[in-house]
Regions:
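Gly/Ser/Thr/Ala-enriched C-terminal appendages of enzymes
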Residues: 2-35, 39, 44, 48-53, ...
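Low-complexity, highly charged intrinsically disordered N-terminal segments
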Residues: 38-79
Length: 475
C-alpha cells in the first residue's frame, strides 16, 4: 500500500526532467547558484474549446515541496551520470527555500528550476480532470455524477488523484475506494454484470443482492434483456426481499443500449409497480455531450456514472500548462525576462506579477481578470480602464466593481505557510466560483472569450522588452 500512499509518504524529488539537473549543475558551475529567479506557471489553451479551467492539485504540490530531499541513492545515481562533486554536495545539503504563490484549488482560471516537472504534473493533471468533471456535472443539470473511471485511468496515480479532482469539479463520489481512504471522496458502487452471471438466474442474483444490501439496493438490469427480464426481475426482487422487511429500493442501472429510450420505458414500469421513488442510474461511455442529448431527448435518468471519458478527459486529454522564467534578481533589483517566439501566442509576459479578478459589485459576476506588476494596487473605488493586450484599441472603463487578488502564498522562504482546506470546502468553493461566471462563458460550444488583460504598466514593460530584443536581433 506504500506505493498508493499520499505524496506525504513518497519521495518524488527525482521525478524531474533530466535537463532540470543538467541546468542546475550548470548554474552552480557558472556562479549562478544563488541567483533569485521568478517563474510563472500558466496555460494557453482551454481543454475542449471551453471557457475556463478549474485549478486543482495545489495540496499535492505543497506535499511534494515540503518533502523535497535528495537521498544518498539519488546522489549516487547522479554521480554515475557524471555530475560534479560540487553539485552533488549542494544537493546532499539541499533545502527548499523558495516563495510560492498559487491560485487556490477550485478557482476557475483563464489562461526554481528542477521543481518544474512536478509543478506542471500536479497542476496540469488535476486541473484537467476537475474541469472535465465540472463540464459533465453542469450537463447533468443537478443530477448527481459518479466518477466510475478507475479501471480506465492511465495508471493508479491518475485514478486516485483523478477521483480527487473530479470531486472538486462537482462529482458526488467515486468508485475508487482508496480515494475515499486518502481524501474522503465518497466511495460509491453497486454490482457488475459478473454478479448476475454467477447465479443460475437473474432473479436469483437480484434477490440475493437485495437480501444482502436492503438499504442500498441498486440492481444492474441490462445483463440479458433490460426490458423483458432485467426490469421485471428487479421489480419482483424488490417485492420479495425489500417490501416485506420495510425497505424501499434505491434504484436500477443501465450500462448499455439506448438509455434515453430504455429509461423512459423502465420509469413507466417502475411507477406502475408502485416504485415511483426508485431511481434510474445510467452509465456506458458517457460525457457532457451525450448526457446533454439524453436529457434533451427526455431520458428519465436520475444520476449518471461516468468513467473513461472523465478520468482521461478523452476528448481533450492534455492541459498544456507551461513553466517560464519571468524575472531574475540582480544586485537586489528584480530584472524582467521575456521569451520571444515567431508564434505570438508563445511570447511570455515578463516581470513578477499579481493576478486580480474584477467582479461586478451588483451582480457578483466576474467581469475580467487583470494581471499587474506585483507592486501595483487596484483601487476599486475608482474607475479602471482595461484593454485587450493584443488589440489595444479594444478598451473598456470598469466602474462599480470589486477587485480581488487571485493568489495566496503557499511557501515563504521554503516553509509552507498555507493550510490546505478540507476537500469538501474546496468543492463548495469551486461551485461558488463557477456561479460567478456568466452563462456565455460556461456554454460548451463557442463560449465567450473571458478577458485576461494586462495593466498598462505591465503591457508597457512587455513592449519595452520586445523592442529591446528586436534591436538586438537586428545587430
Amino acid at each position: 500500500m506504500d506505493s498508493l500512499n499520499s505524496l506525504k509518504g513518497r519521495n518524488l524529488t527525482m521525478l524531474v526532467d533530466f535537463y532540470e539537473m543538467t541546468m542546475a549543475n550548470g548554474y552552480l558551475k557558472n556562479g549562478m547558484g544563488d541567483t533569485v529567479a521568478y517563474f510563472d506557471m500558466f496555460f494557453r489553451k482551454v481543454p475542449d474549446g471551453g471557457g475556463y479551467v478549474i485549478m486543482a492539485g495545489v495540496e499535492q504540490l505543497c506535499e511534494y515541496l515540503k518533502g523535497l530531499k535528495f537521498t544518498p541513492e539519488d546522489i549516487e545515481y547522479l554521480r554515475g551520470r557524471g555530475f560534479s562533486e560540487e553539485f552533488l554536495d549542494y544537493l546532499a545539503d539541499f533545502k527548499f527555500s523558495c516563495d510560492v504563490y498559487a491560485v487556490p484549488e477550485g478557482t476557475p482560471i483563464f489562461q526554481a528550476q528542477f521543481v518544474e516537472t512536478m509543478v506542471l504534473l500536479c497542476i496540469n493533471h488535476q486541473s484537467l480532470i476537475a474541469t472535465k468533471a465540472n463540464r459533465i456535472v453542469r450537463a447533468a443539470q443537478g443530477r448527481p455524477i459518479m466518477e466510475f473511471g478507475s479501471r480506465r485511468a492511465q495508471g493508479f496515480d491518475a485514478a486516485i488523484y483523478g477521483a480527487r479532482a473530479a470531486y472538486i469539479g462537482g462529482c458526488a463520489g467515486t468508485a475508487c475506494a482508496v480515494s475515499d481512504i486518502m481524501f474522503g471522496v465518497p466511495a460509491l458502487g453497486t454490482m457488475a454484470h459478473s454478479w448476475v452471471q454467477l447465479f443460475d438466474t437473474e432473479l436469483e442474483a437480484f434477490c440475493a443482492y437485495a437480501r444482502e444490501y436492503p438499504d442500498n439496493c441498486v440492481l444492474l438490469v441490462d445483463t440479458y434483456n433490460a426490458l423483458k427480464s432485467g426490469v421485471p426481475n428487479a421489480i419482483e426482487a424488490f417485492k420479495r426481499e425489500l417490501l416485506p422487511r420495510g425497505y424501499r429500493p434505491k434504484g436500477i442501472r443501465f450500462d448499455s443500449g439506448d438509455i434515453a429510450y430504455l429509461s423512459r420505458k423502465a420509469r413507466k414500469m417502475l411507477d406502475e409497480a408502485g416504485f415511483e421513488d426508485c431511481t434510474i442510474v445510467a452509465s456506458n461511455s458517457l460525457d457532457e455531450y451525450l448526457i446533454r442529448d439524453m436529457i434533451g431527448q427526455g431520458a428519465k435518468v436520475d444520476s449518471f456514472g461516468v468513467g473513461e471519458r472523465l478520468i482521461t478527459s478523452s476528448s481533450s486529454p492534455v492541459l498544456g500548462g507551461v513553466y517560464k522564467l519571468c524575472a531574475v534578481e540582480k544586485d537586489g533589483k528584480i530584472c524582467p525576462r521575456i521569451k520571444i517566439s515567431d508564434n505570438v501566442a508563445k511570447i511570455s509576459t515578463p516581470c513578477f506579477k499579481k493576478p486580480w479578478r474584477l467582479f461586478d459589485r451588483e451582480t457578483g459576476k466576474a467581469i475580467a481578470d487583470l494581471v499587474t506588476l506585483n507592486n501595483e494596487v487596484i483601487d476599486d473605488t475608482k474607475p479602471y480602464e482595461i484593454f485587450d493586450p493584443d488589440f489595444t484599441w479594444k478598451r473598456k472603463i470598469v466602474e462599480n466593481y470589486v477587485a480581488k487578488p487571485l493568489t495566496v502564498q503557499l511557501f515563504k522562504d521554503g516553509e509552507c505557510v498555507y493550510e490546505c482546506p478540507p476537500l469538501d470546502e474546496v468543492k463548495r468553493y469551486c461551485a461558488e466560483q463557477i456561479d460567478t461566471l456568466w452563462d456565455e462563458v460556461l456554454r460548451f460550444d463557442n463560449p465567450h472569450n473571458y478577458y485576461v488583460d494586462l495593466s498598462q504598466k505591465l503591457w508597457d514593460e512587455k513592449q519595452r522588452l520586445l523592442a529591446e530584443h528586436g534591436k538586438k536581433g537586428e545587430q
